[in-house]
Every structure is written in structure tokens, then in C-alpha cells.
Amino acid sequence: IALLQTLRTRIRDAKRVATVAEFGPRFLHSTGQTYKGGPNSGVFTQITSQDAADLPVPGEKYSFGVVKASQARGDFDVLAERGRRALRVHITGDLAAGLQTLSAAIIAAV
């Protein structure tokens, strides 16, 4: 979380834009509706990763990880369908290392 907040403030300061870091799926309904239905003024980066541990949904053939990934994919698809500027990054393997690599690339770009 600290790395994402640092990255967020670096982008804010470099580009002089408002930034926010949110974690799903809890944000998907409330703030997600604003992003998908409000003015086309945002730029979005959706970061997903494999769960370190996954649990099966009782009585189903799929897991909670599959449900979470489906929610993220659906949210991204709606942003894309509405013409929002959005990038999805899926990190596999070591999450901390992947976030460090992503952070370094974004900082170099801004």
C-alpha cells in the first residue's frame, strides 16, 4: 500500500493532477460508477495479481480468486467500452517485485 501511495503522489506532483489509489472489489460500485458514468477526464491503471492463497466457493466449481478476477476484468471492460483511458497490468509471481518494477517504469515515464 505504501508503494502505491508513493507512486500516486509522484504522479500527482509530476503531472499536477488529482490522483487516487483504491482497492477492489470494495470500490467497484460506489466510486466505480463515477468513473464509468462521469465525465471522460480520468486515466486509470488497474493492477491485478494472482492470490497467494485461494479458496473454493462452497458448492461451486470455481474459487473466490476467479470471482475477484472476473469482477476486475468486468470493471476494466466497462471502462474500455466507455472510451476511458485505461491500462490493465496483471502481476504474476512475486507481487512486491512486480510492483517495484511497475513503479520504476511509471516514475521513469512521468
Map each language-model feature to its residues.
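Phosphate-moiety recognition in structured ligand-binding domains
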Residues: I1-V110
